[in-house]
UniProtKB/Swiss-Prot annotation:
This is Glucose-6-phosphate isomerase. It comes from the Bacteria. Its EC number is 5.3.1.9. The gene is pgi. Keywords: Cytoplasm, Gluconeogenesis, Glycolysis, Isomerase. The active site is at 351 (proton donor), 382, 510. CDD domains: SIS_PGI_1, SIS_PGI_2.
Length: 545
C-alpha cells in the first residue's frame, strides 16, 4: 500500500463515504446548503452543494489536502521549484500571466522580464499584421492565418479563439491544422490565397513530426502558388526554441518567438503559442485573458483551502474517483462558444494525471486521472445524458454557463438556463418509484402496466454535479475558468503524489511511430515485430486489404 492509502484520513474517508445520506435528504435537512456550499472568485461562481458531501466529508477532504502538504506544494510551483522531477524542470506557466512588476527568478534570471519582452514583440507583430503594415510577397495585406501545431500548441489556441469569437476584430480569418492526415491541411489550403496567407509554425524543437510535415507541405504549396524561397520570410513565422532550424527553413530570425522548458505544451496558450488568439482578438483582449488567469493564480496561492475554488473542485473529483468508483467526469458547457472546452480539459487532465507511479516510483494502489469528456448543452440532453441519469456508472458532472448571452435572441437564453439548472436538479433529486407511479395514475394503462413502466421511469438521483456561472463570457472570465481547471488538475496530482507535468506515454508513442515509419518505407516486408504489427504494416505497403 502507498502512504496515501495507509493514512488515517484516507481510511476515515473510506469508511465515511459508505454511509452518506442521499443528496435529496441533505437538501431537505438544510435550507442553507446552497449558501454554505458555494463560493465566488475571479468573476466565477461555483455551486458545489449538489455533491455527496456533509460537513464531515468536507472536513476529511481538507484534512487529506493538509496531510499532503498541498499549500506547500502550491507555493513550490509558483516559486519555481523543480516539481517536474523526471525531466528536472520547473513548472512556471503561471509566470506567463504574472504582473509586470513581479520578479520570478529561475537560475538567477527574472523570467517575468523575458515574458514581458515577448509580449511586447507579440504586440508589435499583431499591430503590423492587423494594420496592414505587414505585406505579403505581392504587396497585399494578410487576410488569413494558418496555425500549425499539435497537442497544446494546437488545441489551446483553437479552443480559446473559438470561445472568444465575439471579440474577434474582424481583420483576419484563422485556420488551425494539427493532424498529419493530409486531408486536414489540403482542405484548408483549397480555400486560401498564397499572396494573403500567413503560416505560424509552433514547435519547441522545430522537429515535431506532424507539425514539421504539415509546415513543409504548406511551404511546398506556397512555392507552387508563385512564392519564392526569399518570400517565405513574409509568409511564415515560428514559435520555437530552435532558432537555427527555423532560419534554415527560411523564417526571419526577427519573426521567431521563444518557447521555454518551464512551460509544458498543455499550459502554453498563455505564451507566444497564443499568437493566433492575439491576432484574432487584439493584444488588449489577449492581456485581459492573461489577467483573468492571473487573478485565479492569486486566488489559488492565497485563499484558505476551505475557500479555494480549484482545491474544492479537485478534492471532489478525487472523492468520486477514489471513494465512489467513478471512472469518468463529464464537462457540460451551456454556451455554444464554449463547446470546445471539454476537449481542452480532456487533454489538460488526462495527459497530466494519467499516471500509475508516485514520485518515488511506487506503483499506485488507487485510481488516478479519470476519463474527461463532454459537450455542449442542450445537445447532450438528447444523447449521453441518459447514461448519466440512469446508467450504472457514476459520472460526476460540471455544468458551465454565463448568465448573460452575447446573442440575446428572444427566449433562447432563458430556455438554455432552464435546461441547465433543471438537469442539475434532476441528477441530484432523481425520481423514486412512488413518484413515477403517481405520474402514470389516470393514464389508460392497466395497473400492471403502470407498475412495470414506473420501474423504467425510476431515476436514482444522488448524481453529483458542480455548477460554474459567470456574468458573461469575456477574455477575463475565460482566463479565470481555464486557470481554475489547470489548478484543479494540480490539486489531484499533488495529493496523489504523482508527476502531473511529464507525459512519457506520449513520448513512447512518438518513438514507436518513428520506428514503424521506417518499416513502412522499407524495401521489404516487416518481419521482426509482433505478428499484428507486421501484418498491418505489410497490408499498408500493399495498399489494399
Amino acid at each position: 500500500m502507498t502512504r496515501l492509502t495507509q493514512s488515517d484520513t484516507w481510511q476515515a474517508l473510506s469508511t465515511h463515504t459508505q454511509s452518506l445520506p442521499h443528496m435529496r435528504d441533505l437538501f431537505e435537512g438544510d435550507a442553507q446548503r446552497f449558501k454554505t456550499m458555494s463560493t465566488s472568485a475571479c468573476g466565477l461562481f461555483l455551486d458545489y452543494s449538489k455533491n455527496r458531501a456533509t460537513e464531515e466529508t468536507l472536513s476529511l477532504l481538507f484534512k487529506l489536502a493538509e496531510d499532503a502538504q498541498l499549500q506547500s506544494k502550491i507555493a513550490g510551483m509558483f516559486n519555481g521549484e523543480i516539481i517536474n522531477t523526471t525531466e528536472k524542470r520547473a513548472v512556471l506557466h503561471t509566470a506567463l500571466r504574472a504582473s509586470p512588476e513581479q520578479e520570478i527568478l529561475l537560475d538567477g534570471v527574472n523570467i517575468v522580464q523575458e515574458v514581458q519582452e515577448t509580449q511586447q514583440k507579440m504586440a508589435e507583430f499583431v499591430n503590423a499584421i492587423t494594420s496592414g503594415q505587414w505585406k505579403g510577397y505581392t504587396g497585399k495585406r494578410i487576410t488569413d492565418v494558418v496555425s500549425i501545431g499539435i497537442g497544446g500548441s494546437f488545441l489551446g489556441p483553437k479552443i480559446v479563439s473559438q470561445a472568444l469569437r465575439p471579440y474577434w476584430t474582424g481583420e483576419l480569418n484563422c485556420h488551425f491544422v494539427a493532424n498529419v492526415d493530409a486531408t486536414s491541411i489540403c482542405e484548408k489550403l483549397k480555400t486560401l490565397d498564397a499572396e494573403t496567407t500567413l503560416f505560424i509554425m509552433s514547435s519547441k524543437s522545430f522537429g515535431t513530426q506532424e507539425t514539421l510535415t504539415n509546415t513543409l507541405s504548406a511551404k511546398d504549396w506556397f512555392l507552387k502558388q508563385g512564392g519564392s524561397q526569399l518570400d517565405v520570410a513574409k509568409h511564415f513565422v515560428a514559435v520555437t526554441s530552435n532558432v537555427p532550424k527555423a532560419t534554415e527553413f527560411g523564417i526571419d530570425a526577427e519573426n521567431i518567438f521563444p518557447m521555454w522548458d518551464w512551460v509544458g505544451g498543455r499550459y502554453s496558450l498563455w505564451s507566444a503559442i497564443g499568437l493566433p488568439i492575439a491576432l484574432l482578438i487584439g493584444m488588449d483582449n489577449f492581456k485581459a485573458l492573461l489577467q483573468g488567469a492571473h487573478e485565479m493564480d492569486k486566488h489559488f496561492l492565497e485563499a484558505p483551502l476551505t475557500e479555494n475554488m480549484p482545491v474544492i473542485m479537485g478534492l471532489f473529483s478525487l472523492l468520486y474517483g477514489n471513494f465512489h468508483g467513478a471512472q469518468s467526469h463529464v464537462v457540460l458547457t451551456y454556451d455554444h462558444y464554449l463547446r470546445g472546452l471539454p476537449a481542452y480539459f480532456q487533454q489538460l487532465d488526462m495527459e497530466s494525471n494519467g499516471k500509475s507511479v508516485t514520485l518515488d516510483g511506487t506503483d499506485v494502489d488507487f485510481s488516478t486521472g479519470p476519463v474527461i469528456w463532454g459537450g455542449e448543452g442542450t445537445n447532450g440532453q438528447h444523447a449521453y445524458h441518459q447514461l448519466i441519469h440512469q446508467g450504472t456508472a457514476l459520472i460526476p458532472a460540471d455544468f458551465i454557463m454565463p448568465l448573460q448571452s452575447h446573442n440575446p435572441l428572444g427566449e433562447h437564453h432563458i430556455q438554455l438556463a432552464s435546461n441547465c439548472f433543471g438537469q442539475t436538479q434532476a441528477l441530484m433529486q432523481g425520481r423514486n418509484y412512488d413518484e413515477a407511479l403517481n405520474e402514470l395514475s389516470g393514464s389508460k394503462l392497466s395497473a400492471d402496466e403502470q407498475a412495470l413502466i414506473a420501474k423504467h421511469k425510476v431515476m436514482p438521483g444522488n448524481k453529483p454535479s458542480n455548477t460554474i456561472l459567470m456574468d458573461k463570457l469575456t477574455p477575463s472570465t475565460l482566463g479565470s475558468l481555464i486557470a481554475l481547471y489547470e489548478h484543479r488538475t494540480f490539486v489531484q496530482g499533488a495529493i496523489w503524489d504523482i508527476n502531473s507535468f511529464d507525459q512519457w506515454g506520449v513520448e513512447l508513442g512518438k518513438s514507436l511511430g518513428n520506428d514503424v515509419l521506417e518499416r513502412l518505407s522499407a524495401d521489404s516486408d516487416a518481419t521482426s515485430l509482433d505478428s499484428s504489427s507486421n501484418g498491418l504494416i505489410n497490408m499498408f505497403r500493399q495498399g489494399k486489404i
